Amino acid sequence: MTARRSSFEDEAVDYAAVGATQRSDLMQYPPEGYVPSEDEFRLGSGEERFALATSALLTWGLHRSSGVEITDVHPGTGVQYGGIAFAEDGTPLEPIETHEEQRFAEDGTPFITPGTTVVFAGSVGGEPLVGPHRVISVTEEPGHVSLAIGTMDGDPESGEQSFTIEQREDDSVWIVVRSFFRPTKGAAKLVGSKRRRKTMNDAYLRALLPSRGL
């Protein structure tokens, strides 16, 4: 695997603290001006449940089951941010790229790759979710798979959200949703609010339940 530096000027996100949803202290020290959130929900247990949940996450199944239409998809190159250090104000320092090869689900659906850009249209839990987004990172480790997505210019809110599927020591499988958002200029104050995020997170958390067919 080769790492190289880049400015990431093409298809850039509209916020500075790229990757901050992966920080353990996000809830205590969110990027300045942003509202953080974190919720988790148990999906079941076992290897099969973990595999089904992670496959759904990495093929947009989570979003589609939550009521979001995925449009204008431009696959990424597999390049993602890695090894990010943060300043005290949450600004990332010296981002490094890593390259990941394209992978596919059992049914042949391509997995989401870092750098992919999409436009969301629809609603989650009755809350509108629209606008352009970029996949910041995809992490696959034993018992831990995560997807981080950031907003781009033209979105009514600015920030990042990560979705993590975990298989814990007791074999239980969980989804963890973390984010930080604020409304963009001219957007309604409700956008980026704690109530809106809680409503949306609850819908995301339940979208992967076995009863939903995933």
Describe the role of every protein-language-model region:
Residues 5, 9, 181-214:
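A conserved amphipathic terminal alpha-helix motif
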Residues 34-36, 111-115, 128, 158, ...:
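A general secondary-structure signal for short beta-strands and their flanking turns/coil
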Residues 119-169:
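Hydrophobic-ligand binding "helix-grip"
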Residues 151-155, 178-186:
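Short, solvent-exposed aromatic-acidic interface loops
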